A protein has these predicted regions:
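Active-site HxH/HxHxD metal-binding segment of metal-dependent hydrolases
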Residues: 1-64, 68-72
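Solvent-exposed, acidic/flexible segments
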Residues: 6-9, 24, 60, 103, ...
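Catalytic core of the metallo-beta-lactamase
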Residues: 58-128, 135
Length: 192
């Protein structure tokens, strides 16, 4: 399952040799539109990590199956819901929800003890998407980065921490832009 189109997800997935690779239609569209650029950018920014980039099979990992909004899989008796609950980190954000176990795999919509990457973010939508995740009432959550959240209290802390960062950045940028500040001043005010 590709949680979104970023190279950190799409480059390494081929190493698993999976028969099927699932992505949302939005994620597939973003791989088509930006995947190669994102791959080249990652390689350029982190050459130490890509010393043997030619060893990555097939470069980008392409989905073999796509879905729109929801797909349900059964792994024996285990129900796995693959959901798009809104935009946030990217347009194609996808989560995996195990309703019987109340475990949520959030992709990069939630990051714990890590700063969320927001280069492709939908700041206005992300808080509502976090509300949509919370509405599932997960008791455990595996974030895109950071330790697994093992209790409902930790899950709430992870959601709240991500929300606080996104909201703080958005409100700071919005206030600076309303004052007509140039980009450098907006950056300085936001990350001061």
């Amino acid at each position: 399952l590709l949680s979104h189109y970023h190279a950190v997800r799409v480059l390494g997935a081929s190493a698993y040799g999976a028969e099927h690779i699932i992505a949302s239609e939005d994620t597939r569209d973003l791989i088509v539109e930006r995947g190669q650029f994102d791959k080249d950018s990652e390689i350029g920014r982190f050459p130490r990590l890509f010393q043997n980039v030619e060893s990555v099979p097939d470069g980008l990992t392409w989905p073999t199956m796509t879905f729109n909004k929801k797909m349900t899989l059964w792994l024996g008796k285990l129900e796995v819901q693959i959901l798009q609950l809104g935009r946030g980190h990217t347009k194609g954000d996808t989560v995996a929800w195990l309703p019987q176990e109340k475990i949520l795999f959030s992709g990069d919509l939630v990051e714990f003890d890590a700063t969320p990457y927001a280069g492709d973010a939908y700041f206005k939508d992300w808080p509502q998407t976090l509300d949509n995740l919370a509405a599932l009432k997960p008791e455990k959550l595996v974030p895109g980065r950071g330790a697994a959240l093992q209790t409902p209290e930790q899950v709430q802390a992870g959601l709240a921490g991500t929300r606080a960062f996104i909201s703080d950045v958005y409100e700071s940028v919005k206030a600076s832009a309303a004052q007509g500040e140039d980009l450098r001043k907006v950056y300085e005010a936001t990350f001061a």
